[in-house]
From Swiss-Prot:
Its main location: membrane. GO terms for cellular component: membrane. One of its GO terms (molecular function) is ATP binding. Pfam families: DUF4668. It is a multi-pass membrane protein. The chain crosses the membrane at residues 60-80, 114-134, 157-177. This is Uncharacterized protein YLR036C. Keywords: ATP-binding, Membrane, Nucleotide-binding, Transmembrane, Transmembrane helix. The keyword Nucleotide-binding applies.
Amino acid sequence: MKEAELSATESQDEIPKSNSLLIIEKLTKAVCSLYFINCFMVPSVDNLIEKYPKAIIIKIIDMILGAVTISLVIIVFFLYRKNGHFKNENKTKPKRCSKVVCPSCAARKKYPKWFQLKYLLLVSMTAFSFYFCTKIRFFFKTDQTINLHRLSQLFRLQLGWICTTALLFYFYDALILHSGFIEGYRCVNGKGAMSEGKTGQLN
């Protein structure tokens, strides 16, 4: 009942978004995704302009995309601030694991330091996606040749960046999801809730 009342009060406190704001928000997310892909998965063409003059078109598109992205982000920021959505966002709680029996929560409660260290190490290991990003951005710095072999090298770098970045976000979400406060003893092992109830009855 308490959880239902809390959810009801939270839903009442939420400020509804207008249709125009929702459209601009979706457009901004789409443009930001394109800009994100362009920044991290597309090589810089600055070193190709001298050998391939038409590469300047890609450079111009890159600049236009960056300007549009910045403009949309600024517009959404001021619309959020004007309508008071930032206050509502600050009230929202971070997502936590809601499973009754969760091995990750059990490991966190039993070995809290090891749990934090393990996930931080995994996040730091996948952080070498920065290496792939750097190699992609400066792919044409030393060699401006464009052929099938070079494109296959670029594809392997892009695939490596996608995999490492996906792992980075996965482990980061897992770290945040299972790092919340765990009530009681229900997730210590597979029979945590049952064993706690039995020990309580025996005592």
